[in-house]
From Swiss-Prot:
Similarity remark: Belongs to the universal ribosomal protein uL24 family.
The keyword Nucleotide-binding belongs to this UniProt entry's keyword annotation: no
Naturally occurring in which organism (per UniProt): Gluconobacter oxydans (strain 621H)
InterPro entries membership: KOW, Rib_uL2_dom2, Ribosomal_uL24, Ribosomal_uL24_CS, Ribosomal_uL24_KOW, Translation_prot_SH3-like_sf
HAMAP family reported in the protein's UniProt record: Ribosomal_uL24_B
The protein's name: Large ribosomal subunit protein uL24
Quaternary structure (record): Part of the 50S ribosomal subunit.
Keywords: Ribonucleoprotein, Ribosomal protein, RNA-binding, rRNA-binding
């Protein structure tokens, strides 16, 4: 399946505690159908110190969100949009914003 949301994209959270928040995608996990978004779904993790120099304590980190709860923000208009695909004349398959028809780079 082609990736509609990729690392570095700006997305809008559609549901959950962080509903309405925009953020940048830090990582995508295609097999789990989840993504990690900066500043969204932040959880506190209690960690023990380890020998490799890692300090213990309470660490805040972003947790994965299901891709169905995210919507890509169109880079041109700044509004959330659905994503489609189009094959260009040179044979490349590119992502396209459904709302504006603009090609999404990346």
């Amino acid at each position: 399946m082609a990736a509609r949301i990729k690392k570095g994209d700006q997305v809008l959270v559609l549901s959950g505690k962080s509903r309405g928040v925009r953020g940048e995608v830090l990582a995508v996990m295609p097999k789990a159908e989840k993504a990690v978004v900066r500043g969204v779904a932040v959880a506190k993790r209690h960690t023990k110190p380890n020998r490799m120099g890692g300090e213990g304590g309470i660490i805040e980190r972003e947790m994965p969100i299901h891709l169905s709860n995210l919507k890509l923000v169109d880079p041109k208009s700044g509004k959330p949009t659905r994503v489609g695909f189009r094959i260009l004349e040179d044979g490349r398959k590119v992502r396209v914003a459904k709302a504006t028809g603009e090609v999404i780079e990346g």
